[in-house]
Regions:
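Calcium-coordinating acidic loop motifs
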Residues: 54-56, 60, 69
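Extracellular/luminal recognition modules and glycoprotein regions
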Residues: 44-45
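Transition segment at domain starts
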Residues: 20-41
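Short edge-strand/loop segments of extracellular domains
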Residues: 80-84
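Structural motif
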Residues: 71-77, 122-126
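Acidic, small-residue rich beta-repeat scaffolds with periodic aromatic anchors
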Residues: 1-25, 86-138
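Primarily EF-hand calcium-binding motifs
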Residues: 48-50
Length: 138
């Protein structure tokens, strides 16, 4: 499902096509060199701001991405149904900040959760509960 490009993982094709249709020229939101180095030690081969997990607990691999498009950042989750993905915008376009990054949260919630962190500031989590996404302050 995930594609390796020169040892770097990229989003599944269906996710890339969906992102292309919403914002031609999008890219995974770049991060500071310090954050990139930290992410590389935790998850070699995975780029910053591409996050796989089972966010709704159905056993399928879902995907969250923090993208940069036309100078704005947007957080989008893609829930897998086994044959495709449903797109859900979690955070509408806002000013892009290279100190913002995603990380996977396990064991704190019923299912995997999306952590949205700001370097040296803190952050929040997006948790899928009762059929909908909820933002939780951490």
């Amino acid at each position: 499902m995930f594609l390796a490009a020169q040892t770097m993982i990229s989003p599944p094709e269906a996710v890339r096509k969906e992102l292309d249709s919403g914002c031609a020229g999008w890219q995974l939101a770049p991060v500071t060199p310090e954050i990139a180095a930290e992410i590389k030690t935790r998850t070699p081969g995975w780029p910053p701001n591409l996050l796989p997990g089972d966010f709704n607990g159905d056993g399928q691999t879902d995907v969250a991405v923090l993208i940069e498009c036309r100078g704005s950042a947007q957080l989008v989750a893609f829930l897998s149904n086994g044959s495709g993905f449903s797109r859900q915008v979690l955070e509408k376009p806002q000013a892009y900040d290279p100190r913002e990054f995603l990380h996977l949260i396990r064991k704190e919630y019923e299912h995997d959760a999306i952590g949205v962190e700001y370097e040296a500031v803190g952050g929040h989590a997006w948790v899928f509960r009762d059929g909908r996404w909820q933002s939780v302050v951490r």
